[in-house]
């Protein structure tokens, strides 16, 4: 039984470990007609419309219309996910209790991450509405630019976690179909060759050493798998935080540069206003002085010419 579930889980775990290297696409792979996927598609369509930041979007963002619509779509999606998970639990065949609990825990964690992503998106749009309403007619271009950047990042995170949830539900569904269609006898028949191979290996290795070795290998594999998932999630979260911090620093630097430029222009205008009257006054005084000097020189020249004439 464990070997069967190990075969089912290997592709899922491989995909999870590769998430950090693959670019998140715009659509979920392998979509079906499940109600929860249809509800999620409606959420995607609405989010794509919000990301256009058209005039209508801007108008509705300034009210509570967008957040109300998102709330309804979020609740519909999570309700359908819970219903589908419950349906699979009821169909799940006679698998080991440990396997059942582990799968349920993984699906629950993926479901919680997707719900948290949706909640973060709604809160960010509410924050944007508050910021726009406080601008009171001022330019909101910078706010729209930052919102557009945040929406792209949030959409990537949503797609990543939605894809993860879909993969884990697929594994859950595989177990349910196996139990519903074939039952215990079919599973035993399928596992017969594996059991026989295990017995042969046990005979070769020794009855006392084979089972503890397999148990230790299984435990080590579980620990490594869990640790790799934990490290991968932490690394992705940290990278996202660093990117957001760098974006905020860049925005602040641009804002400060603009402020410094404006202050320099204002100071230059003030300096010009201070010195222009002084320069004009000095020019007038200099012109008056030159006129007086020229008049004095002319008077002296006339006087010098008149005196010799009188002496004659």
Swiss-Prot record:
Any GO molecular function: heparin binding
Signal peptide per UniProt: 1-18
Residue segments, region 8 X 22 AA approximate tandem repeats: 72-247
Cellular component per GO, a single term: extracellular space
Region (Lipid-binding and lipoprotein association): 202-282
Record's keyword terms, sorted: Chylomicron, Endosome, Extracellular matrix, Glycoprotein, HDL, Heparin-binding, Lipid transport, Lipid-binding, Oxidation, Phosphoprotein, Repeat, Secreted, Signal, Transport, VLDL
Organism placement in taxonomy: Eukaryota, Metazoa, Chordata, Craniata, Vertebrata
Protein's name in the database: Apolipoprotein E
Similarity section: Belongs to the apolipoprotein A1/A4/E family.
Residues the record lists as Phosphoserine modifications: 139
Post-translational modification: APOE exists as multiple glycosylated and sialylated glycoforms within cells and in plasma. The extent of glycosylation and sialylation are tissue and context specific. Glycated in plasma VLDL.
Subcellular location: Secreted; Secreted, Extracellular space; Secreted, Extracellular space, Extracellular matrix; Extracellular vesicle
Positions of region (LDL receptor binding): 150-160
Homooligomerization: region residues: 258-312
One example of a Gene Ontology biological process annotation: response to zinc ion
Highest taxon above the source species: Eukaryota
Its biological purpose: APOE is an apolipoprotein, a protein associating with lipid particles, that mainly functions in lipoprotein-mediated lipid transport between organs via the plasma and interstitial fluids. APOE is a core component of plasma lipoproteins and is involved in their production, conversion and clearance. Apolipoproteins are amphipathic molecules that interact both with lipids of the lipoprotein particle core and the aqueous environment of the plasma.
UniProt keyword Transport, yes or no: yes
Positions of the UniProt region annotated as Specificity for association with VLDL: 270-282
